């Protein structure tokens, strides 16, 4: 029994070691479709990182809220660049995407991350009134330009499911999860 347990532990270590080799990750991702990895200026983390995580997210999506929580590990490790591209599948909800963009543009990345976390935790139930406390200037042309950039990215990729996560423009290979990305840089 002890021998089997030791052997299993050794195999797990070897697998983890191999899995965290960026060359292995890149090789597995090589045959996947590639998408534009610069679809947003809503970015968090290390701007010089060689790892770009693109998050295609719907502010009202519960799995997107769960993904945002999982991304906290990457955000706080500061080992990659995380960019958000917002979508909604109901045009009436586009205003929330614009509010989230406005928070980023008017308060900066650090505060925006906190606000996004609060939104996904329970702010979404308050809808537009959630943003009242921020006194956002919603008449900025920059908000509309960024919103249209997100819309264009959505049209060009033809993604229709959220959350969709890309790493350096490709989908995460089988056997990996988003938390593994912090070890690839």
What residue ranges belong to the model's regions?
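Secretory/periplasmic and organellar redox-cofactor proteins
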Residues: 1-48, 144-146, 156, 176-178, ...
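Short amphipathic alpha-helical surface micro-motifs
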Residues: 36, 64-67, 148
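C-terminal cap of thioredoxin/glutaredoxin-like
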Residues: 1-4, 50-52, 72-75, 132-185
